[in-house]
Amino acid sequence: MSAHDPHASLARPAAKAWHARLELGFERQPGGRTALAHRRHVGPLRVQRALYPEGDAICHAVIVHPPGGVAGGDRLEIDVKLDAGTHAVLTTPGATKWYKSNGLDARQRIDIDVGARAKLDWLPQNNLFFDATHASLEFVLKLGDGASVLGWDAAQLGRQAAGEAWSTGSVASFSKIVGPSGRALWVERARLDARDPLRAAPQGLGGFPVYGTLWALGPACTNALAESIAPALPFDDALRAGVTCIAPGTMLIRALAHSMEALQHLFAEQWLALRPIVHGIDAKPLRLWQT
């Protein structure tokens, strides 16, 4: 990416802000096929056609946002529902770029409902926050009885490839995972300001510009599993990771890094290792990752 990327200071007038919404619904058909039965979009947020590289039981779909990035005043809303017994793999083709603010916040809301005994692999590319971004992100995931989920969220502050630091701006985030009983299994609310000392503090980001969380959810996610993973996780000046089983069936791997490539590689490795345990299904690298 060039240091003269014209999107770095994109200031779209509020009247031209995008309000995009995408609804996806997966249902189980006779014979065990997972079908993308409901698909509705408003604005420039949509999904490419359903793919079946692993056979009919697992539906793969790629969510795309054609303009390529999110500017001040934009609102993105994604609602996903997996019916009982379905299995979906959702990803994105590239990083979501959050451009310099025009004075308005850019907002994203994602709501996912995973039905009983359904399986979800939520594998988006990372968020890339440009300098002077003002963004607000909300993520809510609901689990049905016997459901399992592997997914992640990763972010980078500033465009390192362009030599750009994240010196001004703010990112507000809210994440919530809700169990079958309706009880929250994990809730995290954070507001990160570019000038906050917490960015450099050991109890914060420790000076790392890249951070992320991988969550593994389901009956197989136990303290014993977390303890078996922990010794192999890196903890050095380039990449630091730790794992915790915060509640029965809820395991988190948190990571800090100096490069997004290193963090993505770690999360992809963990997904490949965890999928047979959490979903009971072998894993292969997504074809999209290899392009």
UniProtKB/Swiss-Prot annotation:
The keyword Translocase does not apply. The keyword Chaperone applies. UreD, UreF and UreG form a complex that acts as a GTP-hydrolysis-dependent molecular chaperone, activating the urease apoprotein by helping to assemble the nickel containing metallocenter of UreC. The UreE protein probably delivers the nickel. Disulfide bonds: none annotated. GO terms for molecular function: nickel cation binding. Its main location: cytoplasm. This is Urease accessory protein UreD. It is found in: Cytoplasm.
